[in-house]
């Protein structure tokens, strides 16, 4: 009897499992042209999943963990909205509507990448695009922020792929980049945005790339101290719990005497952080890999402005990690050099130091890398780091892409 109930519950659990798609696969998505297109998600183990799009029919079987992946053959660019159908052998299906094929770029960084078009010099562009009688095929998806110690499979996006009617809420730098590409290429342009304000570069970097870079031992140790699956992590947590036990006794005695308790011991490494090395890569980049893209654009540096030359090592690890994770060893990577900031002061160089290090990185890593100078576009602003002119820097970045990739 018990065995029968258990089997019934198990079958019910399998039956209740629904076919799911990875976060970038929503209505109105843009797929990368001229490349194999990975499609993946989850379902009950053993389920057969079929994808139908643009005359292709591809199938895959969910593994023991319920994960499945297939690849569409390279697609031609198309301005025609079509249905992307996903179904399984249990009668479940998803029809994604309004799907286009064109160019897709991954976009990341901190607050100046997050900054919306409606609050920048791109606002007129955004207004014109949102009110255009004929819709311009520029779309953006923004991946929600999750911090994690290990790479995650799933992510979320509040709105999925947004059409250009909502351009005022797009990333300003990404919108101007996409618009410049569209003007020249006349194909749909998609922006896969995974950025977060006030965040250091190492948070967006793949763990293996940090571990393998000889100049990033401090970042590596922060990760290993927090990972109980490593010997270093086990020792760090043993020490933490010993310190915590001692602290509890000291704090208790202090409280009994009416005194002030000392500060509680910190968790080891990045365990007590949420924007530490690799945490945003794990939580909000890994889940969208290997969505097919042409390349990546990057705007960041404020939170690392005191790094000195180690920032060049961190940029090297960022690029190598992304290229490795996507399986694109020649992935194009274009970035903005830091803007001017602060009033002229011999005691305060503003961002001059990190601009120099960004230039050093660029000179030593020229393969499919481009740097956009913007110090002539955004003058020093003592009042804030969020510069207004986000129109022209990304137009310059688009020129890198148009010259090198098209």
Predicted regions and their residues:
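Hydrophobic h-region of N-terminal signal peptides that target proteins for export
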Residues: 7-15
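Cell-envelope and extracellular/periplasmic
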Residues: 17-406
């Amino acid at each position: 009897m018990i065995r029968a109930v258990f089997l019934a519950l198990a079958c019910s659990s399998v039956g209740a499992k629904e076919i799911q798609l990875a976060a970038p696969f929503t209505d109105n998505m843009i797929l990368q042209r001229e490349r194999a297109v990975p499609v993946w998600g989850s379902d009950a183990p053993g389920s057969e999943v079929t994808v139908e799009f643009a005359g292709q029919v591809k199938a895959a079987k969910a593994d023991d963990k319920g994960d499945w992946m297939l690849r569409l053959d390279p697609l031609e660019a198309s301005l025609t909205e079509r249905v992307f159908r996903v179904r399984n052998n249990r009668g479940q299906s998803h029809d994604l509507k309004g799907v286009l094929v064109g160019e897709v770029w991954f976009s990341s960084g901190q607050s100046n990448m997050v900054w919306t078009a409606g609050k920048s010099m791109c606002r007129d562009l955004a207004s014109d695009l949102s009110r255009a009688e004929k819709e311009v095929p520029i779309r953006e998806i923004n991946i929600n922020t999750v911090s994690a110690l290990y790479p995650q499979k799933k992510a979320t996006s509040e709105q999925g792929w947004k059409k250009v009617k909502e351009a005022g809420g797009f990333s300003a730098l990404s919108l101007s980049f996409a618009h410049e590409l569209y003007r020249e290429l006349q194909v749909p342009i998609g922006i896969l945005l995974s950025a977060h304000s006030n965040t250091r570069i190492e948070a967006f970097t793949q763990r293996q790339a940090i571990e393998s870079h000889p100049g990033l031992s401090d970042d590596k140790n922060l990760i290993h101290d927090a990972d109980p699956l490593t010997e270093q992590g086990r020792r760090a947590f043993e020490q933490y719990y010993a310190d915590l036990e001692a602290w509890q006794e000291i704090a208790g005695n202090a409280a009994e005497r009416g005194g002030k308790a000392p500060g509680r011991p910190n968790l080891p490494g990045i365990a007590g952080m949420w924007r530490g090395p690799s945490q945003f890569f794990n939580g909000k980049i890994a889940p969208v890999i290997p969505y097919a893209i042409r390349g990546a654009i990057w705007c960041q540096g404020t939170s690392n402005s005191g790094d000195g030359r180690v920032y060049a090592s961190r940029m090297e690890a960022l690029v190598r990690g992304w290229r490795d994770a996507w399986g694109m060893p020649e992935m194009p990577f274009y970035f903005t050099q830091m803007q001017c900031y602060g009033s002229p002061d011999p005691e305060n160089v503003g961002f001059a130091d990190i601009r120099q290090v960004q230039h050093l990185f660029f000179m030593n890593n020229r393969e499919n890398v481009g740097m956009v100078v913007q110090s002539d576009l955004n003058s020093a602003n003592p009042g804030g780091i969020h510069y207004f002119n986000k129109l022209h820097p990304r137009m310059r970045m688009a020129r890198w892409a148009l010259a090198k990739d098209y």
